[in-house]
Amino acid sequence: MTQSLSGTAAGCDTCGFKLGEPIAKLEVSDLCFVSDHRFPGRCVVTLHQHATELFELSPSVRRAFADDVSRAARAVKLAVNSFKMNYEILGNAEPHVHCHLIPRQLDEPKPKVPAWLHPEAQAALAAGKAEEIKQRIVTLLGQASAA
């Protein structure tokens, strides 16, 4: 199931965690878009329920979260034609289960450097480009759930 959430304010009712603009409601999480010119298509998959660790989740929710991450990653990768998707599950700064999806491109200044060590400062994408990418991601998610 995928439901578009563009423009909707979402966040954890317990801790208030929210990162990015929610663009789709997945089975147990929201897909949020982060406008980042260094990594066009960057998103965060944020678990609906509050938890700080994957092992705190029931097996069914943990599997569903992994499926949400996988579905979202596929849509993002296809939307921006990246050669590799980086998955980051951290949590020391924001103690709420979430996974960063960072599409990597071969023509980046330093494609083999971890995203957090990128030499350029983050800046937003041009509004039109961001909207185009978000729409492609949501469309691809819809196609995946119809298959």
Where are these regions (language model features)?
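HIT superfamily nucleotide-processing domains
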Residues: 1-147
